[in-house]
Amino acid sequence: MEDKYYLYHKTKQICFFTLDKQDITSCIINKANINYLPIPLKRILHNKDEFVSIENDKSIILNDEGLILLDCWLSDREIPVNRDNYNKYIKKNNNALLWMLENYAYSLIDCYWINNENNTINYDEILLLKDNIDNYISVITNDNHYYKGINSTLGGQLEKFWYKSNGRVKLCKKVEKPFDVINAREVIASLIYTKQGFRNFCNYEFVKDKVDEVIGCKCFAFTNENNELITAYDLLEEYNLTQQDNVYELIPKLAAKLGADKTKVEKQMDLESIVDFLILNRDRHQGNIGFLRNSNTLKIQSTAPIYDSGSCKHLEGVYPEDLLNTTINGLYNTEKELLSHIRDFSVLDVSKLPSIEEIKSIYDECIYLSEKRKQKLLGYYEERIKFIKNKQLEQSYSDYDIIL
């Protein structure tokens, strides 16, 4: 028997789709609210011959290829199967998709939600559910937070959950203790941005357990009912451009089409790419470059605060790992490729970087980080600062030659 669902953006009903177990069997898009389609699904509108079966004045009916696009969007919204402690979230005889749909697929980072045809819930009630967030004490002492619907749309491999502290919403990312260095990178990145005088970043702090060992990191939420997160992946996927060699250059252009300041986007991308290079963050993929969109006008207002600078578990310490040939899970395959796209190395003030002692003091809080690995990371930091200085000199000489 098929289940019937409606996809909404706030109060706008966008489409109706049917689900047979985990398979989407049909979808009808409401043309009256077509502007509210999730950005990746707007690819349908640019390629109707490929994704549309029938179109009339009021609706668009998707063909099998169109249903695959919708399925991909839903899959990206649910928690991934490689999530740490996945089985704590997903009960027996259930799966991530059904758990998400049971909880209306709402998220704290955007205004989309999904309702079963048999439910009578409205958007005001969804907002109440969004606000039903545990405070930190109850979260860490009660495993039931794993099952709260507010966490059913949190992506990424690391275990994470929303909570409230002094009335403000925060995100906690947890990691096994042997990978505490991932949290250290978030804290180091925060220190670098602070010293640069750059404000548009998530200020991460360590989360420690009762024996004072690092088990995660936390930061304030930066989205709300009026400001939602869209990613570089969303912008690229709309035009099927995620695999292009010039994605670094395409992202600011596509963001500008929706209202972003192209120059500011370019500057922030250059800065975060350089900082990632300094701290060996190997995970700045398309989903980790974000923008804040006005949820009413659907226009980009600004770049999102820089988030997720900690790298990823499966690449921690993996070779090749050196000055330029380090493999990354990013816009390109290696750091060397990524650095070749940076427009302006002078966006970083090297004189304001944290000292090696300041970086070491952060690493020292990670007791599972071996002394050998710590010294290697500190060596990389110093070596990479020298590299950036040289790139800045090369660029300044090049600019001087152009003026002559």
Task: Describe the function of each predicted region.
Residues 1-274, 278, 292-404:
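Phosphate/dinucleotide-binding and metal-coordinating scaffold of catalytic cores
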Residues 281-282:
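Glycine-rich phosphate-binding P-loop
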Residues 285, 290-293:
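Conserved protein-kinase catalytic-loop segment immediately C-terminal to the catalytic Asp
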